[in-house]
Amino acid sequence: MGRRDAQLLAALLVLGLCALAGSEKPSPCQCSRLSPHNRTNCGFPGITSDQCFDNGCCFDSSVTGVPWCFHPLPKQESDQCVMEVSDRRNCGYPGISPEECASRKCCFSNFIFEVPWCFFPKSVEDCHY
C-alpha cells in the first residue's frame, strides 16, 4: 500500500468514526448567544451548515473574519440559562444551594469559579440559528 493509499484510508476512517459518533444539534440559544469573537472553530474550510450541525456544532456565516462553524455554549437545564458567563447577573449569594437558587426561579451552574453560580434567566425570544 502506497503513501497516498494510506492517507486516503486514514481520512475515510476518521470520516466514518465521525459519522458513527453522531452529535446532537445544539439549541438556537447555544449558538446565537455566543459572541462572534469567542467562537472556537469546529469545522473545515467550505463546511456546509448541515455538515456543521451534524457534528454537533453551530453555523453562522453572517460575520466575516470569525469561524462560521463553531462549538456551542454548554447545554444547560433550560435554554433560558444558556449564556456566556460575562452575561450572568447575580441572583443569589456566595454558597447558595441549587435548591435555594431554583426557589428564586433562577439558573444554577457551579462549573466556573469567580462568576455568579446563581443567575437570572434570559428570555429565549432572542435565540435563533
Swiss-Prot record:
Q: Which residues form the P-type domain?
A: 29-73, 79-122
Enumerate the SMART domains for this protein.
Answer: PD
Tissue expression from the record: Stomach.
Asked whether the keyword Secreted is assigned, the reply is yes
Q: Enumerate the subcellular locations listed in this protein's record, separating them with semicolons.
A: Secreted
* A Gene Ontology BP annotation from the UniProt entry: maintenance of gastrointestinal epithelium
Database matches in PANTHER family: INTESTINAL TREFOIL FACTOR-RELATED (PTHR13826), TREFOIL FACTOR 2 (PTHR13826:SF17)
Q: What is this protein called?
A: Trefoil factor 2
